[in-house]
Amino acid sequence: MVGDKPIYVQMSEWLENEILCERIRENEKVYSQYQLAEMFNINPATAAKGINILADQGILYKKRGLGMFLSAKAKEKIQYRRKNHTLKKLVEEVVVEARRLGVDEEELIGMMREASRPDP
């Protein structure tokens, strides 16, 4: 894993992406901390920190003796948080940069429409 975020945060975001892509479904068992540690070549305690982030957010729940499972509505919770926090922050940063560069609202909206078009 590469980036400026801690490895356990990157791993929890990877798990979120797996959930968003529906590779893990509601009430399905998720990877154990040991499986994740092996997959990402990290310490199991680090993997556990990433899992705990999602458990603290209600994305995962624990079944005693069985492991961690995906909560109902987990995908919707992730989408809501990312849309209302992550995406909003990114848009605000783009708007600030556009202002610095003298890009007006109409031009910026045009750029966003262009970027959102599917590739031919």
Label every model-predicted segment:
Residues 1-30, 34-35, 79, 85-120:
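Extreme N-terminal segment that seeds HTH/winged-HTH DNA-binding domains in transcriptional regulators
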Residues 9, 44-47, 64, 95:
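Hydrophobic alpha-helical segments
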Residues 23-24, 28, 56-65, 69-72:
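Beta-hairpin "wing" of winged helix-turn-helix
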Residues 52-57, 73, 106-107:
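Short alpha-helical linear motifs
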Residues 66-84:
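Short, charge-rich, low-complexity interaction segments located
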